[in-house]
Amino acid sequence: MMKNRLMKGSLAALVSLLATNAMAAQEVTVYTAFETDILAKYKSAFEKDNPDIKIKWVRDSTGIMTAKLLAEKNNPQAEVVWGLAGSSMALLKDEGLLKPYTPKGLEDLHANLNDPQSNQAWFGNDAFFNAVCFNEAVAKQLNLPKPTSWEDLTKPVYKGHIAMPNPASSGTGYMQVSAWLQNMGEDQAWNYMRELDKNIAHYTHSGSKPCVQAGMGEVAIGISMASRGAKLKTQGAPLAVITPKGIGWESEAVGLVKESDAAKRVVDWSISKAANELYVEMYPVVAHKEVKATVSNFPNVQANMAKMDFAQMGSKRAEILAAWSEKFDAKSEPKS
């Protein structure tokens, strides 16, 4: 009897150990376009609150990640998409890649950053904005005036001194191209981009890179992310972060691809107050109603925000990118 009890006890302990190990080994594949330098912090915070789940990040810029998800449509590899532009999420939903879901805590979010349709499938994390990063030290050396409008950037004095994200690779680039098209009108916007292209040194495949290059003095001007400009300026880069009237902006969002319990818990946590308290360290506008903060050196964006139609950005994406690539892709940097 004693031997049987010992065997049963050992067996129960073994089953418990195996179950614990199985839970510890549970991994969720998350596709993202969040900036690389914040991924470790988000992963660590989530896993601290959910020790039985591990996040496996797959990261690329918005355009490349959107194309990857569409290419995998018939055999999805992602379980969650977290930190991708709202216009891309709208497109993914239209293509049947995102599952309708009601995450815990949805009522605590600002509704204007979420999927506007009744069968909601994506939910805002933050809003991100474009800006012009202007290196004042380089400008002084080259005698370049400080630009105050988009039209200023077409002046011959800036020839070869501007970097901008390729919109086919970067959501930051695509949302600014969309802002020009939606607010200038298509004919005027394409004419504007032709004039701007004369002054472009190169197009990057990262939304933050033009501002990083401006901060390092590799170019004088980078059309880029306002949050990156603010961060670099706070770190000591000689930058002015300029917001011309009609700056592009968009929500960054999360959505469910596979309906596992673990994937749902990632989505739930991503809209939580704890997650939003991390977002606000970089983004001054976040989805949670109770989370507000001031980001050092972040420009006043509200007065100069373009009117943005995110559904149109999603539906016209392929058409716009094909036209842009045909006209301007020759100046793009090589893809790494």
Which sequence ranges carry the predicted segments?
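Sec/Tat signal peptide C-region and signal peptidase I cleavage site
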Residues: T20-A24
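Early extracytoplasmic/lumenal segment of secretory-pathway proteins
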Residues: A25-A90, V212
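Extracytoplasmic ligand-binding site segments that recognize negatively charged/polar headgroups
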Residues: A33-A40, Q77-E218
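A ligand-binding cleft/hinge motif common to bilobed small-molecule-binding domains
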Residues: S87-L91, G215-P238
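Periplasmic-binding protein-like
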Residues: A111, V157-P165, Y192-D197, Y203-T204, K233-K258, S270-K292, ...
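A bilobed periplasmic-binding-protein/Venus flytrap-type ligand-binding module shared by bacterial periplasmic
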Residues: C133-V138, S178, E250-A262, S270, ...
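An extracytoplasmic/periplasmic, membrane-proximal ligand-sensing/linker region
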Residues: D187-Q188, A287-S336
